[in-house]
Amino acid sequence: MSLLLDKLDRAAERFVQPLGFGGSAKREPVSPILVLGAFEANGGSQPQKTKKELLDGAVIRTTNTTKKSVLEKTTKSLGDLMFGTWSESPQAALTKGADFEIFSSPLTSLAVLSDNDRTFIMNIELSLDEGLIRTIDVLPVSGFVIQLNNVPQLTLEHLMQIGRISTATSKPVFLHLSSIPSEADLSSLRDIGIAALIVELENNSDDAFMKLNKALKNMPQKPNERENRKVNSSSPYTLNKDTTDVTPDDNDEWDDD
């Protein structure tokens, strides 16, 4: 399983049980929204030590001119930090060691996407036709990226644009931003269905990422999250409230018409 998908599952749970014995061990908080730092393979903005500790992963943007040697040097500098690539179309030759691949072209071959050993995330336009939006949940990808770049502040219109996509799919939706959103916006982004933020490293300081990390971990759970955790832990079946056994007895008499 992709490490990214595993982290998304953990984020949905909000808390993880640390290693150890006994039920008294304190459960560690997990950010409800992942934070991935984005930078160009040919640029010099890859994360330094401080930012690495504040990120859940990195996204390396590549182009048709990105050399394999340059990408290998870049990924080596990331150490153990999970990373993925972002290109116009999936490029197997440039994805050695990558946990996931983001691509933008709707003309990508289905044969490429049939490789079960790779995790594909598709970048889609917010302006996508309503009819096409209804089809995205059945596409052979693991999630979607939408972009709001050069936005000074988030507005209700932005939330409605995001909601057109997030409410049309059960798969995780990532939001790509030039700048880190304000703390006041984070709850709205979570509630509208954003699973991860992809934030440009070049535009944001270590201090800004530190504040984001703290704000996400301190974000209160939604009431229905607490209730769902309670329900799911008490019963494996939650769809039907009526658990009466309706299986007919072998000795029941049935009237013949």
Task: List each language-model region with its residue ranges.
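C-terminal helical cap(s) of enzyme catalytic domains, especially alpha/beta-barrels
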Residues: N203-D256
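Hydrophobic faces of well-ordered beta-strands that scaffold small-molecule active sites
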Residues: S31-E40, D56-T62, G79-S87, F100-F103, ...
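Catalytic cores of alpha/beta
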Residues: Q46-T50, S89-G97, S127-V138, S179-L197
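Flexible, charged surface loops at secondary-structure boundaries
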Residues: E28-S31, K49-L54, T75-L78, A93-G97, ...
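Conserved N-terminal beta1-alpha1 strand-loop-helix module at the mouth
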Residues: M1-F83, V246-D257
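Active-site-adjacent beta->alpha loops and helix N-cap segments on the catalytic face
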Residues: T62-L78, E88-A92, F100-R118, L128-L132, ...
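ATP/nucleotide-binding catalytic cores
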Residues: A98, M122, D137-S142, L148, ...
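Short, basic, helix/turn surface patches
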Residues: T85-P90, L128-T135, V173-H176, Q221-S234
